Amino acid sequence: MIESLEVSIWGRSFTLPVEYDCYEGEEVTKAQIRAIKNFQAHIKWIEQSKSIVENYCREQVMSDKENAKKDNIFSYIKPECLFVKRDKENPRIAMMCKYRYDLEHGLAVVFSSDGKVTVGIQDIIL
């Protein structure tokens, strides 16, 4: 089982803990292990997600008069961990982030096994 992963996210290196969606006492499933290995094999998905995340955040970022670094994605997003959903049919990994404009719900960048990227509040994967 992978407990942390070193990844380059939009030009910066991070070591992110990997959290698995499991009930108490339940073991990580084979599908979850396959999902994280598939994600490792397609790390380029992270770089490709940057424009999707920027588009999702654009309105809030542009209306923020206090943020002088609007062109720096890390001025409003901080990757915190990778979350591996327990789902045999559609294995997904989410990069869970702190989000300056929604501290309560944060932001999730969800990667499906087919490379599809979805962005939204963390509730979209939890």
Task: Report each predicted region and the residues it spans.
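Long, contiguous N-terminal structural blocks used for assembly/anchoring
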Residues: 1-70
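Acidic, proline/glycine-rich low-complexity IDRs
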Residues: 1-13, 17, 72, 76-126
